[in-house]
C-alpha cells in the first residue's frame, strides 16, 4: 500500500473515530429538590420533558449532591473531589469566624473562595481529549480569574461570580458574560437557546455542553399567565383552602405542601428549557450519540429564602442535613447503553460524574484527580460496583436552618454528627426515609463504628471545623428561635395564602410580572 493510501486511511479512521465519540449535555439545576419533578411524584408541578428524559435513561434513586448548598456541590462535580478536599465548603460569599453574628453556638469554619487552579476539571480533561467545551449559566465557584473560561470551558455564556441572576430572570439583567436580551426575555430560555445554538454549530466535533441553570434559585419569578394557570390548578386540586402550610422544625418553618403558583411557573419554564435542548439534539440527529445528564446542586428550598416548595416525605431541604437537603434528581441517559425506564438503588454522588464522563468518552481516567468519585458505567450497563459509604461535611450554618454537621451514609444507615455539641442522629433510611426516629440510643455499636469511619474520612480530606463563639448567649438564641416560631410562622402563612388569591399582584415595580415570555 502506498504512503498516500495509508495517509488517506489514517485520516478516514480518525474522522470515523471522532464521529463515534460521544457528546455530552449536562443539565445542572439550581435548588431543585428530589420531589419537585413529576416522575418523582409531584402532582402540582408540570415537568413532561424532564420526565421523558428520566424515562429514557437510568434514574439513581439514591443519587446525592456533594453538599446541601450550591458552591461546594458545583466544585465537586467539576473536580471529582469532596468539598473538604477542594476546600469550598460553603456557598461563596457566606460569612465565617467572628464575622458570623447570628447568636449561634459556634463560628463557621473558613473556606476557599475560588476553584483551585491546580485541579484539572472535567472540562479541562475533555478539552485536552479533543472536545469543544461550552458553559451556560450559573458558575458561583470563583471570582474573576476563576470563571468557566479559566477552568477548561472554551465558551462561557453567563457564568461569573454571582449565585443568582442580577436584575432578575427577565431582561434587562446584569451579567458581564451574557448580553441582556430584549426587555422581557426570560433568562432560563435564553440559556437554553444559547445551548441549542452551540449544539447546532458543533455537529462535526465532539462536545460538552454544560447548561447550569440559575433557576429555580430565588428570586421566585414567573409570568402573570403562568402564575394564573397554577392558581386555577391549585383550586381544582383543592389546595387553596389550606390553613396550615408550614411546620416548625428545630430552627425554621418548613413548607409542607406544593402549591406555590409562582414557583410552579418557574418549574414549567425550566422544563420548557430542557425541552428546547432535547429537541435540538433530535433535530440534528445527535440524540443518537449524546449522553445526557440531569441533576441538581442541592435540595429544594423548603425553609428560608422564598420557602418555595415541599419535599415530603423527605425531611428538610436546601441547606439542611437531612435527605431533603442532599438527595437529588440524578439521571443519566446513554444511547445504546442505558435501558429506558430503568432505575438503580446504588449510592451515587456528584463526584461520580467526572470519572463516568471520562469512561464514556473513551478517555483515560484520572484517579489522582477524581479521588472521591467512581465511574458508574458498570451500573449503567446493568452491572454492580463495590458497595461504599458516602460522606458529607458542612462546618457552617445554612440560611435555611442547616447546622454544622458531618454525615456518613452506609447501606441503609445514615449518621449525622453535630459539631456544636457532639450529639448524633442515626436513621435507618429504608424504614424511616423521613428521618423521624433517631435510633442512636438503640444501636450504640453501629454509632461507634460509623463515627470511626466518618472521623477517618474527615482526617483524610483535611476537613476544617467550627470553633466556639465566645459571644454566645443561650438566652439570646432561645429568644431568636421563639421569635421565628411565632412571628415568622404567622407572616409566612399569610404571605403564601395570598399567592393563591386570584387578585394578587407583586408589590413595587415588578417588570417580570408583565412579561409575555413563557
What would you call each of these model-derived segments?
Residues 10-17:
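Hydrophobic h-region of N-terminal signal peptides that target proteins for export
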Residues 29-45, 61, 65, 82, ...:
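Active-site-proximal cap/lid insertion segments
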Residues 48, 77, 138, 287-290, ...:
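Polar, surface-exposed loop/tail segments
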Residues 84-122, 174-175:
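His/Cys-centered metal/cofactor-coordination and adjacent catalytic loops
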Residues 123, 197-198, 404-409, 413-417, ...:
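Short, surface-exposed beta-strand/loop micro-motifs that present aromatic residues
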Residues 2-8:
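Sec-dependent signal peptide recognition
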Residues 20-25, 56-61, 129-134, 154, ...:
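Loop/turn elements at helix/coil->beta-strand transitions in domains of secreted/extracellular proteins
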Amino acid at each position: 500500500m502506498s504512503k498516500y493510501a495509508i495517509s488517506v486511511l489514517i485520516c478516514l479512521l480518525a474522522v470515523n473515530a471522532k464521529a463515534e465519540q460521544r457528546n455530552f449535555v449536562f443539565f445542572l439545576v439550581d435548588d431543585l429538590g428530589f420531589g419537585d419533578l413529576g416522575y418523582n411524584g409531584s402532582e402540582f408541578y408540570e415537568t413532561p420533558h424532564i420526565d421523558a428524559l428520566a424515562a429514557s435513561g437510568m434514574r439513581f434513586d439514591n443519587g446525592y449532591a456533594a453538599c446541601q448548598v450550591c458552591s461546594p456541590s458545583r466544585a465537586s462535580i467539576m473536580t471529582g473531589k469532596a468539598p473538604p478536599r477542594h476546600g469550598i465548603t460553603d456557598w461563596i460569599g457566606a460569612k465565617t469566624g467572628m464575622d458570623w453574628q447570628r447568636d449561634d453556638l459556634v463560628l463557621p469554619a473558613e473556606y476557599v473562595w475560588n476553584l483551585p487552579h491546580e485541579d484539572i476539571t472535567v472540562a479541562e480533561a475533555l478539552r485536552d481529549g479533543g472536545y469543544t467545551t461550552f458553559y451556560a449559566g450559573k458558575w458561583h465557584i470563583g471570582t474573576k480569574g476563576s470563571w468557566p473560561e479559566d477552568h477548561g470551558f472554551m465558551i462561557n455564556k453567563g457564568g461569573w461570580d454571582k449565585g443568582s441572576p442580577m436584575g432578575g430572570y427577565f431582561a434587562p439583567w446584569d451579567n458581564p458574560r451574557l448580553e441582556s436580551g430584549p426587555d422581557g426575555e426570560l433568562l432560563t430560555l435564553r440559556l437554553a437557546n444559547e445551548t441549542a445554538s452551540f449544539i447546532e454549530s458543533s455537529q462535526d466535533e465532539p462536545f460538552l455542553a454544560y447548561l447550569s441553570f440559575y433557576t429555580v434559585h430565588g428570586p421566585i419569578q414567573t409570568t402573570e399567565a403562568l402564575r394564573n394557570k397554577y392558581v386555577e390548578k391549585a383550586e381544582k386540586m383543592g389546595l387553596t383552602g389550606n390553613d396550615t402550610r408550614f411546620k416548625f422544625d428545630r430552627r425554621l418553618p418548613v413548607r409542607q405542601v406544593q402549591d406555590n403558583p409562582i414557583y410552579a411557573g418557574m418549574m414549567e419554564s425550566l422544563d420548557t428549557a430542557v425541552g428546547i435542548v432535547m429537541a435540538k439534539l433530535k433535530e440534528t440527529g445527535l440524540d443518537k450519540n449524546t449522553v445526557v445528564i440531569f441533576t441538581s446542586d442541592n435540595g429544594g428550598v423548603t425553609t428560608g429564602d422564598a420557602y418555595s416548595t415541599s419535599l415530603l416525605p423527605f425531611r428538610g431541604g436546601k441547606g439542611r442535613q437531612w435527605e431533603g437537603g442532599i438527595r437529588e434528581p440524578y439521571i443519566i441517559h446513554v444511547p445504546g447503553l442505558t435501558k429506558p425506564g430503568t432505575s438503580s438503588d446504588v449510592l451515587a454522588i456528584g463526584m461520580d460524574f467526572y470519572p463516568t464522563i471520562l469512561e464514556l468518552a473513551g478517555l483515560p481516567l484520572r484517579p489522582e484527580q477524581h479521588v472521591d468519585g467512581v465511574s458508574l458505567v458498570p451500573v449503567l450497563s446493568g452491572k454492580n460496583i463495590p458497595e461504599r459509604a458516602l460522606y458529607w461535611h458542612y462546618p457552617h450554618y445554612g440560611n435555611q436552618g442547616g447546622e454544622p454537621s458531618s454525615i456518613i451514609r452506609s447501606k441503609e444507615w445514615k449518621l449525622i454528627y453535630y459539631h456544636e455539641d457532639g450529639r448524633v442522629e442515626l436513621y435507618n433510611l429504608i424504614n424511616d426515609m423521613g428521618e423521624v426516629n433517631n435510633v442512636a440510643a438503640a444501636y450504640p455499636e453501629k454509632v461507634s463504628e460509623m463515627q470511626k469511619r466518618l472521623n477517618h474520612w474527615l482526617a483524610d480530606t483535611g476537613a476544617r471545623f467550627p470553633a466556639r463563639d465566645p459571644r454566645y448567649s443561650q438566652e439570646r438564641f432561645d429568644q431568636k428561635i421563639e421569635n421565628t416560631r411565632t412571628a415568622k410562622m404567622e407572616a409566612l402563612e399569610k404571605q403564601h395564602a395570598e399567592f393563591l388569591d386570584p387578585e394578587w399582584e407583586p408589590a413595587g415595580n415588578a417588570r417580570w410580572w408583565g412579561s409575555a415570555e413563557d
